[in-house]
């Protein structure tokens, strides 16, 4: 049990050690269930949410479903769909005139943007003693519909007696409705996971590393994600997952360095 306590201690300390270097730290929570249709087929559903800075405002909500097929014991094929709503934060940009002198601000108001995601997985699992290693290759397609949002333009320094709307000492000049065009993204996400089965213990520690390649950008690596955590089998069909996630890169889900605590629950029928 000492090794288990050490693993849990490390998981609790990791976010604190990394927080100084993070652009963002939040909570990723999800819950789902899965049900076997036969020995080879199963299906499931899940829902999740993510927060932004310091466990603050919700930045993402998602719900999805998937179907899996195991032609042989060590191989699994999965197809799934997810509906995701991303919260785009308010964006404040300085505005400069043709001579390079600042003359106001452009403020894009916050808004929610939906996206539809399809994915197809091929996963292979290799047990070695009490360790098991899983390699998952995922093709992921994401479609963003067009969306509109509000923009406020502030120009001209505020004079004494001004009672209108202002920001940073500049008066509101114009409010416009802006548009983001439809876009589509194609990625290959490769993930390697290692687990360790502790004898007569309900806790299974794991670590994973994942990279994302962008098909539309010469197959460039655009994101890396590293996870350390533990699965706690509280009952035969109930599993709680606690972990720490570090993500670095720029794709359709993240932008910059993100540190998060992940919490999950899964029920198997």
Regions found by a protein language model. Give the residues of each.
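Bacterial Sec-dependent N-terminal signal peptides
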Residues: 1-27, 269
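Outer-membrane beta-barrel domain signature
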Residues: 19-22, 51-56, 107-113, 177-183, ...
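Start-of-domain marker
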Residues: 22-88
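Residues that define the transmembrane beta-barrel architecture of outer-membrane proteins
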Residues: 25-27, 59-61, 114-118, 182-188, ...
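Residues on the lipid-exposed face of transmembrane beta-strands in outer-membrane beta-barrel proteins
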Residues: 31-35, 65-69, 120-124, 139, ...
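Repeated loop/turn-to-beta-strand initiation elements of outer-membrane beta-barrel proteins
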Residues: 40-45, 74-79, 129-133, 200-204, ...
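Transmembrane beta-strands of outer-membrane beta-barrel pores
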Residues: 47-53, 81-87, 114, 126-128, ...
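Outer-membrane beta-barrel transmembrane domain signature
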Residues: 137-239, 245-247, 269
């Amino acid at each position: 049990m000492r090794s288990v306590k050490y693993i849990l201690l490390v998981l609790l300390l990791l976010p604190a050690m990394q927080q100084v270097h993070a652009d963002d730290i939040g909570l990723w929570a999800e819950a789902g269930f899965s049900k076997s249709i036969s020995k080879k087929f199963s299906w499931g559903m899940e829902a999740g949410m993510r927060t932004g800075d310091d466990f603050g405002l919700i930045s993402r909500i998602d719900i999805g479903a998937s179907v899996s097929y195991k032609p042989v014991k060590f191989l699994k094929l999965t197809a799934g769909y997810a509906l995701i709503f991303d919260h785009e934060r308010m964006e404040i940009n300085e505005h400069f005139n043709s001579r390079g002198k600042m003359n106001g601000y452009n403020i894009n108001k916050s808004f929610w943007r939906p996206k539809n995601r399809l994915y197809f997985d091929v996963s292979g699992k290799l047990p070695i003693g009490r360790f098991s290693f899983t390699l998952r290759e995922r093709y992921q397609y994401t479609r963003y519909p067009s969306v509109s949002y509000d923009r406020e333009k502030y120009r001209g320094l505020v004079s004494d007696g001004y009672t209108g709307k202002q920001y940073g000492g500049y008066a509101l000049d114009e409010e416009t409705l802006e548009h983001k065009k439809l876009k589509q993204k194609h990625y290959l996400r490769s993930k390697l996971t290692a687990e360790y089965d502790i004898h007569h213990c309900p806790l299974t520690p794991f670590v994973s590393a994942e990279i994302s390649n962008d098909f539309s950008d010469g197959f460039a690596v655009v994101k890396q994600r590293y996870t350390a955590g533990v699965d706690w089998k509280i009952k035969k069909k109930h599993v709680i997952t606690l972990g720490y996630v570090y993500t670095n890169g720029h794709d359709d889900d993240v932008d910059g360095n993100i540190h998060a605590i992940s919490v999950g629950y899964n029920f198997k029928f």
